[in-house]
Amino acid sequence: MASDLSYFIPHHGRPKVSLCIPESFNLYVCPPSCVRRVSIRALRNDTRGAMGFLFLTEADVATGAYEHAVAEAVAEALTTLERPPRAFFIHLNCIDDFLGTDEDALLDELRGRFPGLGFAVVHMNPIAADRGLSTGLRVHDRLYSMLEPTPHRDSAVNLVGTFADIGGDCELFEVMRAWGVREVRQLFSCADFEAYRRLASSRLNVVLAHIGSYAAENMERRLGIPRVDAPVSYDLDEIGRQYRAIGSALGQVGGVVDGTCSQEGRAFEGRQAPSSAADDEAARLLAQAEGSVRDAVARAREALGDTPVIVDSSAVMRPFALAKALAGYGFSVCAVFALHEKDDDAEERAWVAAQVPGIAVVRGESYEGILDLGLPADAVCIGFDCAYLLKARRFVDVQKDEGLFGYQAVRRLMRLMEAALDGDTVWE
């Protein structure tokens, strides 16, 4: 087989949706063939009213006239849609690398003609995804780019970089309440544009995945919202450090003196620094959660015994970090499917290579790899990709850390691994 071919794993039945802000409209400016997947997805997800297309012709490419046509397309959307959008995302595909659209001039024209509306330009170029900022980082940043600085801070905390609700069984929310956080905000949970705008009033951003790091960095620079990086982890020591970092950030931000804080003189609304009683309650909740998860790890370890375990990058954002954690708990990790490797997993990747040299690493660019590895048929496969390729009977259905954080993530994973021992997944 050709060595330049890569695996493509079909995820039948799993809907593909794009994160967006409420009351927004996506306008794709590109040649017709560039948005076939986007338009098919819109039909499948019934989101046709939230997007439109401005197709470029050869004359547009030659003259640059499409820049003025964008404003006309916005005007048409405002007059024809049942609910006029509050914000527009202008998507420019990879052809813009050759056209060189004057983004600032385009935004100035749109904001001048349509005051009170939000506008952002999004560049979509998968061909250049390996250079500089990835498309995912840039798109995620644009989602928060319409937030405006506010003179007031409330007690809320934003979770950045997540695409799905963290489960109600997660200790994070009770711990936050103990620290005086009245609301945990997430972009996809915003009911309307005003709720989206309130994200700018939050006192702290907690970044749960690398894809949100660039957005949080820019929010810290533009809006003055400090951030704590706390990517989903399955290592108990790292989870403890993350909670200490979040608590420390909330305590530092909470230094209220006569209604103002030390950060750029912004006023706070009815919030005080966490008290010792609040710290004690948070510590109790965290100790309880940690004790529960240590019991869960012990039960799963006893149940699995020497059963081989395979970790997959479709299940978690940092597969080598998960492999390191599981190996540390005593599980028999035999392989890591790194079909979607990320740089933020590099340190753990090096650790696995040095400390657990027997672990096989499967990458998407090699068809021959799987055929020669002789991976065990009875392995517990954590993630769809490895389970699908191996037609594994024991399948742990986790997707990109969705719904998971802190000690709850480890506890739920242990429960799923135990359940997978009796699994009998049948593949087409």
Where are these regions (language model features)?
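An N-terminal assembly and electron-transfer interface module characteristic of large anaerobic redox
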Residues: 1-428
